[in-house]
Each structure stands twice: as C-alpha cells, then as structure tokens.
C-alpha cells in the first residue's frame, strides 16, 4: 500500500483510487450529526481486553446491539467497524497504544496544506482537531 495524495491510497493489486480515507464531512456525520450518533459509537475492550478501541455501528441499528459486542468475531454480524486504539507515533516511537488513537481524515486544512484534520479518541471521548501531516496517526481506508 502506498499514499498517492491527501486522501487516496493504492493497495497492491488494485486500481489507484479504489481506496481512500473518509473526509471531514464523512467523519463528522459518523461521529456527531447522524441520528443517535453518540449511541452508535462506543469504546470497547473486546476479546477479554486484548483488543481496545472504538466500535461504530451502522445507521438505523438499535443501540442495544452495542452491549452484545464482546469480541472481534461479533463485529461483522452487527455491521460494525472497529477502530483499534493504536496510539500515535512521534518519530519512530509509538505512544499510548491500547489507550488512545488518532485517525487522519482525507481533508487537508484549508489555510495550510501541511496540516490535516484528524479524529482523536480516548475512551468515549471523541474530538476533531488539525495537526501537522508529518505526525504519525492511523488511517481507516474505505472503498
């Protein structure tokens, strides 16, 4: 996989532009503006705490489904997306793995292209900020 521009990635064996990161508007919808957004996402410790991160359920899902998700094997059947708490990277050092994560958006800062938007989560606290694109954050690719 390699990065081709601010929001597009190429995965080996697939056409360029097939994979991308979500935009600022798409992340905003998932995390904040859709109906019951705060009930359709939750910090979870799955598989007896082995996998920690944010679970995001699809639209129109009964929020009670969240309590039944206790392992990674439950994710596909519920249509959920799991964002691991992968920490962040500064230089070659990974910090806070298992407790926080930051995920890049495909939207650069309008005023300064060396910055881009990213989502930060710790437990159930989710926020959005802008940071230097050279900093190490995770990406969630979609088709």
Region spans (language model):
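Conserved positions within compact, well-structured domain cores
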Residues: 1-143
